[in-house]
């Protein structure tokens, strides 16, 4: 079970003004050091956030069985039903009581936080493809600002401005406003700032506003996942002031904050990046970055060799850098090329362990590629939106800006690593493994132009439910099956919430899919519309339950984790092939929509699966799908297109074309 990008469509920032005729340049001194000056302190609500509830065991069992129903035949389901009953009345009851007691003793956090960190950090698979996703920025609306040097400078300065704003407590708290006319106002903010932080959440709740957990934000900067035997560690050094830049597999560092914590003049940052872009050194014979794509135990062993070989100080500079800026030397050909580049690249020019890599291609196409153990995308999406808005609306430099007359050869340090023959062999082996894996990955995308959110809402259907129904229908059309499907939902409304799983495959989607795919002529348009409405209603219920911490996946995961921690024999429920099957997520799905995002993507979570990143926009639906050689992503997308056409036909009162 590997959660992907933050799914629920929380509003992140005011709508972007994309066609502003002129732009003020930020001076980056004094007030311009910050993106915003929130009158409510950033962490004002954190202490009073509600705690993530532990569902009742009987509710978890009911929800689990409901999710299993479309995946099992009658005899399999009866067997699973018996195992659930035995678990609920036996060892499960005992484990649940222990979980409740443990949760009572740890009121500073959530019951899932520790186990979830462990799940990520003990995983030994490469972080590339298995965990790290990407989000690509829309181009700067002013085309001349998409020059690589200009955009890299502006994104870097805006990112450092975000860092300063966050650490000064001046970043607006993350709040989900159900009634923004009441809660997203200066008057309310002036009032709530005086409410003690131990009570502030309740004040927001009274005006239908829901503050979200921001505990993950501190890992956004100066952070790296360090490979260790058996379990990795998250490392953060907030004192470091330098940026790490990768280009052609070479490593460079320079300060982006001065000794007083002020942002270095943007024209100096521009000069340093120009200096790096002018370095004509060829790609190193043994590009060290490949090691971050290795199996974690292999990388841990090689890292120790690096340290013992006299590279400790150099590695420390990589690990502690505010973030990693990757400058690529080629433009993007199309969306598929963009996805491959931002999801994995060629392995030489990313440090996959950094909390995030900010990638800027030759044509200014930019993306954030992030490591997933430290957070679920809540912080990344907020950072992403704020940086896009700031860099496009108040850019630090213009295309005609001249770089500072500074000696970058003094300010920029090019890092060099001493590599033993064992390390060189390690890099070569990592490269071979990386190249072989990437050859098996296919990515393809479609844009369905007939309609989107506006049309579906007029038909009183959940846009997300319709997209998920299209995936169920498409898989049935292509492979004749209903399979385990995963949609991640943020539980950031709770203290140290992570994610919960929505299980989109249901008896309703199965019935509706079979009607559309196998027997459309047997059903009237009205019947098909009714089935879609049933799917939408049930999906809405599942989504609400998940967001409120009332799914079944995290609860069962925590009980299993507790059993292992207490040395209890693995309960039979977890040995059931049905449990293995529902957690073998052939359809792993993730959605986000934001004015800043052009598209996102991730790899399948199982070898025979699809990784489906999608967004339902106002008048179109986008879908970016990955697969390994055992599945056909292009054919799947043809099926998705056909299924969306069929559903839109039915909603418009037309007969389904066979």
Swiss-Prot record:
The active site is at 372 (proton acceptor). Pfam families: Carn_acyltransf. It is a peripheral membrane protein. One of its GO terms (molecular function) is carnitine O-octanoyltransferase activity. The modification N6-acetyllysine is found at residues 79, 239, 305, 418, 510, 544. Pathway: Lipid metabolism; fatty acid beta-oxidation. The keyword DNA-binding does not apply. Involved in the intramitochondrial synthesis of acylcarnitines from accumulated acyl-CoA metabolites. Reconverts acylcarnitines back into the respective acyl-CoA esters that can then undergo beta-oxidation, an essential step for the mitochondrial uptake of long-chain fatty acids and their subsequent beta-oxidation in the mitochondrion. Active with medium (C8-C12) and long-chain (C14-C18) acyl-CoA esters. This is Carnitine O-palmitoyltransferase 2, mitochondrial. It comes from Mus musculus.
């Amino acid at each position: 079970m590997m959660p992907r990008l933050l799914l629920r469509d929380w509003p992140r920032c005011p709508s972007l003004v994309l066609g502003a005729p002129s732009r003020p340049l930020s001076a980056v001194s004094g007030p311009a050091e910050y993106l915003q000056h929130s009158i409510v302190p950033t962490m004002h609500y954190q202490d009073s956030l509600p705690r993530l509830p532990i569902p009742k065991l009987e509710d978890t069992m009911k929800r689990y069985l409901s999710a299993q129903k479309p995946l099992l035949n009658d005899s399999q389901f009866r067997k699973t039903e018996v195992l659930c009953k035995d678990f609920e009345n036996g060892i499960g009851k005992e484990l649940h009581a222990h979980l409740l007691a443990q949760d009572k003793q740890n009121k500073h956090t959530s019951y899932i936080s520790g186990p979830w960190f462990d799940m990520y950090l003990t995983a030994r698979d490469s972080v590339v493809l298995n965990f790290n996703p990407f989000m690509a920025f829309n181009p700067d609306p002013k085309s001349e600002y998409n020059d690589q040097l200009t955009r890299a400078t502006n994104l870097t300065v805006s990112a450092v401005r975000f860092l300063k704003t966050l650490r000064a407590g001046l970043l607006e708290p993350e709040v989900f406003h159900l009634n923004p006319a009441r809660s997203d106002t200066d008057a309310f903010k002036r009032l709530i700032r005086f409410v003690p932080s131990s009570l502030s959440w309740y004040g927001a709740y009274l005006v239908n506003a829901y503050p979200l957990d921001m505990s993950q934000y501190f890992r956004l900067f100066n952070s790296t996942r360090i490979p260790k035997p058996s379990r990795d560690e998250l490392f953060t050094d907030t004192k470091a002031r330098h940026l790490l830049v990768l280009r052609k597999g070479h490593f460079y560092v320079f300060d982006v904050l001065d000794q007083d914590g002020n942002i270095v003049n943007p024209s100096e940052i521009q000069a340093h990046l120009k200096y790096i872009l002018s370095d004509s050194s060829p790609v190193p014979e043994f590009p060290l970055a490949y090691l971050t794509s290795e199996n974690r135990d292999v990388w841990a062993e090689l890292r120790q060799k690096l340290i013992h070989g006299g590279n400790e100080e150099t590695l420390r500079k990589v690990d502690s850098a505010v973030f990693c800026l990757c400058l690529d030397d080629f433009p993007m050909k199309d969306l598929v090329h963009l996805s491959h580049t931002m999801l994995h690249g060629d392995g030489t020019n990313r440090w996959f362990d950094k909390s995030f890599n900010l990638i800027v291609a030759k044509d200014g196409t930019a993306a954030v590629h992030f490591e997933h153990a430290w957070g679920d995308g809540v912080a990344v999406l907020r950072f992403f939106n704020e940086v896009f808005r700031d860099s496009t609306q108040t850019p630090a430099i213009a295309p005609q800006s001249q770089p500072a007359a500074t000696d970058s050869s003094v300010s920029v340090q090019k890092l060099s690593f001493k590599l033993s023959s064992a390390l060189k062999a390690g890099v070569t082996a990592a490269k071979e493994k990386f190249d072989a894996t990437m050859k098996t990955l296919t990515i393809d995308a479609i844009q369905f132009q007939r309609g989107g959110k506006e049309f579906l809402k007029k038909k009183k259907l959940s846009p997300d439910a319709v997209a998920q129904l299209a995936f169920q229908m498409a898989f049935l059309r292509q492979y004749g099956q209903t399979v385990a499907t995963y949609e991640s939902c943020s539980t950031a409304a709770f203290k140290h919430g992570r994610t919960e799983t929505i299980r989109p495959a249901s008896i309703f989607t199965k019935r509706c899919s079979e009607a559309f795919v196998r027997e459309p002529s047997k059903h009237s348009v009205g019947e098909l519309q009714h089935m879609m409405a049933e799917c939408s209603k049930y999906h809405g219920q599942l989504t609400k339950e998940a967001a409120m911490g009332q799914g079944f996946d995290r609860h069962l995961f925590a009980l299993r984790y507790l059993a292992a921690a207490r040395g209890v024999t693995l309960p039979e429920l977890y040995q059931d092939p049905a449990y293995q099957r529902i957690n073998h997520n052939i359809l792993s799905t993730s959605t986000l929509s934001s004015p800043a995002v052009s598209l996102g993507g991730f790899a399948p979570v199982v070898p025979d699966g699809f990784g489906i990143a999608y967004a339902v926009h106002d008048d179109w639906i986008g879908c970016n799908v990955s697969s390994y050689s055992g599945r056909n992503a292009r054919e799947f997308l043809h099926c998705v297109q056909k299924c969306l056409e069929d559903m839109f036909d039915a909603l418009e009162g037309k007969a389904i074309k066979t």
